[in-house]
């Protein structure tokens, strides 16, 4: 590992540590997403708390946190395995942000951003998988889990040399959703539509 790669890994973690959900919630005068709603500082929870505008900004920022360092590394011809490490560093920053007392999100949008440099076709398939799952089941967490599990297989069809790197990212996302997985098995996970409608009734 070269000093440049090490510097990019550190930079990816620090960039990932910028919690856009918390900052944008402050900008919109919304409750802290770490202490409200699902307690997850991510776009889905901000959608429940503040609506589409704030959630869209959070989503874009979270995607960019993963995309920028990996895209830079991609154009520097850094090998696929190290690209995976850089993507994981960005996701770990999002999940355990040093600037926000290590209270972060699930890392789904940041992981999607990290996968984007592999190809827009792969990104489209992953987004489609998530949307279809959420549309059918209503569970955002299940959409994330199924998309994470499908990502290595889809990558193998598109660019097989990146399968190992994507598999590492997928494992991180699945592990981060262990609480959601337990609630799904227990039938206690709340559907995203129920949470949004509940918020609307409170207004």
UniProtKB/Swiss-Prot annotation:
Classification via InterPro entries: G3P_acylTferase_PlsY (IPR003811)
Transmembrane segments annotated in the record for this chain: 4-24, 80-100, 116-136, 138-158
Keyword set includes ATP-binding: no
SMART domains: G3P_acyltransf (SM01207)
This protein's UniProt keywords: Cell inner membrane, Cell membrane, Lipid biosynthesis, Lipid metabolism, Membrane, Phospholipid biosynthesis, Phospholipid metabolism, Transferase, Transmembrane, Transmembrane helix
Catalysis: reaction(s): an acyl phosphate + sn-glycerol 3-phosphate = a 1-acyl-sn-glycero-3-phosphate + phosphate
Subcellular location: Cell inner membrane
Bilayer topology annotation: Multi-pass membrane protein
Enzyme class: transferase
GO cellular component: plasma membrane
EC number: 2.3.1.275
Main location: membrane
Pfam families named among the record's database cross-references: G3P_acyltransf
One Gene Ontology term of the molecular function aspect: acyl-phosphate glycerol-3-phosphate acyltransferase activity
Pathway annotation from the record: Lipid metabolism; phospholipid metabolism
Domain of life the protein comes from: Bacteria
Any GO BP annotation: phospholipid biosynthetic process
Described function: Catalyzes the transfer of an acyl group from acyl-phosphate (acyl-PO(4)) to glycerol-3-phosphate (G3P) to form lysophosphatidic acid (LPA). This enzyme utilizes acyl-phosphate as fatty acyl donor, but not acyl-CoA or acyl-ACP.
Subunit: Probably interacts with PlsX.
Protein name: Glycerol-3-phosphate acyltransferase
Naturally occurring in which organism (per UniProt): Photobacterium profundum (strain SS9)
Lineage of producing organism: Bacteria, Pseudomonadati, Pseudomonadota, Gammaproteobacteria, Vibrionales
């Amino acid at each position: 590992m070269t000093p440049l790669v090490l510097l990019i890994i550190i930079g990816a973690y620090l960039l990932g540590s910028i919690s856009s959900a918390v900052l944008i919630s402050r900008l919109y005068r919304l409750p802290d997403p770490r202490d409200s709603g699902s307690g997850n500082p991510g776009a889905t929870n901000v959608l429940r708390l503040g609506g589409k505008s704030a959630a869209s900004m959070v989503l874009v920022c979270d995607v960019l946190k993963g995309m920028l360092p990996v895209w830079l590394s991609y154009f520097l011809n850094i090998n696929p395995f190290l690209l995976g490490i850089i993507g994981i560093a960005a996701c770990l920053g999002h999940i355990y942000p040093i600037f926000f007392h290590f209270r972060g999100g699930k890392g789904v949008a940041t992981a999607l951003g990290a996968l984007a440099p592999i190809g827009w076709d792969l990104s489209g398939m992953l987004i489609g998988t998530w949307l279809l799952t959420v549309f059918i089941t209503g569970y955002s967490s299940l959409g994330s889990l199924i998309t994470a599990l499908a990502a290595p297989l889809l990558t193998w069809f598109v660019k097989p040399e990146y399968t190992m790197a994507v598999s590492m990212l997928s494992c991180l996302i699945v592990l981060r959703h262990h609480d959601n997985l337990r609630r799904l098995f227990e039938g206690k996970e709340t559907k995203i539509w129920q949470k949004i409608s509940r918020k609307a009734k409170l207004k």
